[in-house]
Swiss-Prot record:
It is found in: Cytoplasm. Belongs to the 'phage' integrase family. XerC subfamily. One of its GO terms (biological process) is chromosome segregation. Its main location: cytoplasm. InterPro entries: CB, DNA_brk_join_enz, Integrase-like_cat_sf, Integrase_catalytic, Integrase_recombinase_N, Integrase_SAM-like_N, Recomb_XerC, Tyrosine_recombinase_XerC/XerD. GO terms for cellular component: cytoplasm. GO terms for molecular function: DNA binding; tyrosine-based site-specific recombinase activity. The keyword Cytoplasm applies. It comes from the Bacteria. Site-specific tyrosine recombinase, which acts by catalyzing the cutting and rejoining of the recombining DNA molecules. The XerC-XerD complex is essential to convert dimers of the bacterial chromosome into monomers to permit their segregation at cell division. It also contributes to the segregational stability of plasmids. Forms a cyclic heterotetrameric complex composed of two molecules of XerC and two molecules of XerD. Residues 2-88 form the Core-binding (CB) domain. This is Tyrosine recombinase XerC. It comes from Psychromonas ingrahamii (strain DSM 17664 / CCUG 51855 / 37).
Length: 299
């Protein structure tokens, strides 16, 4: 038995009696702590007083390298932190070396993309009042070019070239990229530009403005898109990120060109684009059969 185990056994008996935890919960605590004991034994640590923050970070890193998901590591780290708090409480340790050490960031689930049919339904707006025209234009541009919310609100008049059907946006790290825009987006921008002067003060640079006659805020855009999602009877909530995600998925489904989608989205790393988009296996197999020279069999 490891020299580290007796204090764990004492701790498990303590929480079983004092906190009335179920046998299943106690077993989970025991299992989580056992992984740390194994790692400490590998690092020749024979006493809990030898544990420090650097070792805790090393163990977290090791678990991550072994392929454990962020949520599992967070659960194990929480169990270790509680155990070390117990050791501090009974003066075995002077401080908790796991306090303040975070698990890897939890993987954020991707938003469900909007289907092509639902996207057409969202953008098929009948209302012709100025705010509706502006909102339709914002959503058309976002879906047309896969814009981030910050990129959309940051667009200035000088950034858009309708004759060339292109727009310059400023992304993360102040990096600029030139993007194509669809004919439909060009048409809605032209309509918006005709009525825009009614909304803004003289010399306002922003393409999209609010009723306060200044650049529209990100929060305002989010609220307006959510409103249109409800009004157009779309399933689920509509938000700017979902439009960007849908653009990426639809483009990848149509082209199968991950590199091109990476460039359009402004991702520095291709891995980000791979995570950002999701295609079902059937569609990926179809792209593979069309693209791989050895997948094309002679009939």
């Amino acid at each position: 038995m490891s020299a580290l185990q007796p204090l764990i056994d004492t701790y498990l008996n303590h929480i079983a009696s004092q906190r009335g935890l179920s046998p299943v919960t106690i077993t989970n605590y025991q299992s989580n702590l056992a992984e740390f004991v194994a790692l400490l034994n590998e690092n020749k640590v024979g006493c809990w007083t030898e544990l420090d923050g650097q070792l805790v970070r090393l163990m977290v890193k090791t678990l991550h390298k072994k392929g454990l998901k962020a949520r599992s590591i967070a659960t194990k780290l929480s169990a270790l932190r509680s155990f070390l708090d117990y050791l501090v409480q009974f003066d075995i340790l002077s401080n908790n070396p796991a306090k303040g050490i975070a698990a890897p960031k939890l993987d954020k689930p991707l938003p469900k993309n909007v289907s092509v049919d639902d996207m057409f339904q969202l953008l098929d707006i009948d209302e012709k009042d100025p705010l509706s025209i502006r909102d339709q234009c914002m959503m058309e541009l976002m879906y047309s070019s896969g814009l981030r919310l910050s990129e959309l609100v940051g667009i200035n008049l000088q950034d858009i070239k309708l004759s060339a059907k292109e727009i310059m946006v400023t992304g993360k790290g102040s990096k600029q990229r030139l993007l194509p825009i669809t004919d439909r987006a060009v048409a809605t921008v032209k309509i918006w530009l005709k009525i825009r002067p009614e909304f803004c003060i003289k010399d306002e640079k922003a393409l999209f403005v609010s009723k306060q006659k200044k650049r529209i805020s990100a929060r305002n855009v989010q609220a307006r898109m959510e409103k249109w999602g409800l009004k157009q009877a779309l399933p689920g909530h509509i938000n700017p990120h979902k439009l960007r995600h849908s653009f990426a998925t639809h483009m990848l489904e149509s082209s199968g060109n991950l590199r091109a989608v990476q460039t359009l989205l402004g991702h520095a790393d291709l891995a980000t684009t791979q995570i950002y988009t999701h295609l079902d296996f059937q569609h990926l197999s179809k792209i593979y059969d069309q693209a791989h020279p050895r997948a094309k069999r002679k009939k």
